[in-house]
């Protein structure tokens, strides 16, 4: 058997998250079904699992296939079976584990105050936010190593809540005629819905609805003020570092 590394992008609006679902509407379901159609029976490992509605620009996968499959041949037959909502960007033979060998994961979140067309609604979140300075002040609180027990949703197999945030910042830009704030958070790994809870806390602070002290108390597991994640549609798994 050969081990392959696949880099994919997918439109999270068409799936119920990355993980396999009882109704077969997970990204993993689609990929494993496509592989099965080619006679390849292999579990597919992802660098990170994304929730319902969350997108990926560069998700990384590892799986095994029989030795008669070369990377070029497999790309040729697999890519059309994943389209149009999953795009196979790159495929190479590599002996590695997509999840355990990953060193960092980078997420981006797109938020605008005024969405001018419904056709971008699945891809840019729409909601109010305060000044960029306040957003970045809040984001800085999360850098470093923390126990993120109060910044996660229930579920998932992870038992260790400690994670490292290497960098977290926000900036403004224009995307298809929309002024957006873009959040970028880079960490070693993330708990379930942790990125969206972090961004929600920062947005609420920028709107002066919560204090910096309340964010710090939640980081230190003293009191949970933010319990509801920000909407999923603006979030992208942007890059995985190995």
UniProtKB/Swiss-Prot annotation:
Stored InterPro entries: PsdUridine_synth_cat_dom_sf, PsdUridine_synth_TruA, PsdUridine_synth_TruA_a/b_dom, PsdUridine_synth_TruA_C, TruA/RsuA/RluB/E/F_N
UniProt-annotated binding residues for substrate: 107
Signal peptide interval: none
EC number: 5.4.99.12
A single GO BP: tRNA pseudouridine synthesis
Reaction equations catalysed: uridine(38/39/40) in tRNA = pseudouridine(38/39/40) in tRNA
CDD domains on file: PseudoU_synth_EcTruA
Keywords assigned: Isomerase, tRNA processing
Quaternary structure note: Homodimer.
PANTHER family: PSEUDOURIDYLATE SYNTHASE (PTHR11142), TRNA PSEUDOURIDINE SYNTHASE-LIKE 1 (PTHR11142:SF0)
Protein name: tRNA pseudouridine synthase A
């Amino acid at each position: 058997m050969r081990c392959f590394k696949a880099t994919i992008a997918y439109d999270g609006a068409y799936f119920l998250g990355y993980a396999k679902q009882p109704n077969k509407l997970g990204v993993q379901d689609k990929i494993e079904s496509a592989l099965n159609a080619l006679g390849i029976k292999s579990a597919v490992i992802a660098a990170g699992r994304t929730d319902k509605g969350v997108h990926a620009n560069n998700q990384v996968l590892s799986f095994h296939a029989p030795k008669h499959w070369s990377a070029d041949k497999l790309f040729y037959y697999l890519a059309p079976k994943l389209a149009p909502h999953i795009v196979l960007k790159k495929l190479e033979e590599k002996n590695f584990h997509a999840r355990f060998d990953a060193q960092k994961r980078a997420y981006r979140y797109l938020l605008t105050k005024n969405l001018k067309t419904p056709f971008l609604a699945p891809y840019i979140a729409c909601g109010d936010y305060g000044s960029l300075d306040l957003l970045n002040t809040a984001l800085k609180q999360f850098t470093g190593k923390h126990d993120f027990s109060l910044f996660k949703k229930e579920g998932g197999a992870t038992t260790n809540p400690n994670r490292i945030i290497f960098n977290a910042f926000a900036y403004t830009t224009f995307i298809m005629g929309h002024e957006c704030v873009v959040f970028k958070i880079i960490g070693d790994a993330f708990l379930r819905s942790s990125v969206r809870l972090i961004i929600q806390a920062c947005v609420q602070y920028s709107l002066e609805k919560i204090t910096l002290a309340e964010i710090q108390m939640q980081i230190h597991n003293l009191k949970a003020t933010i319990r509801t994640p920000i909407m999923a549609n603006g979030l992208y798994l942007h890059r995985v570092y190995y």
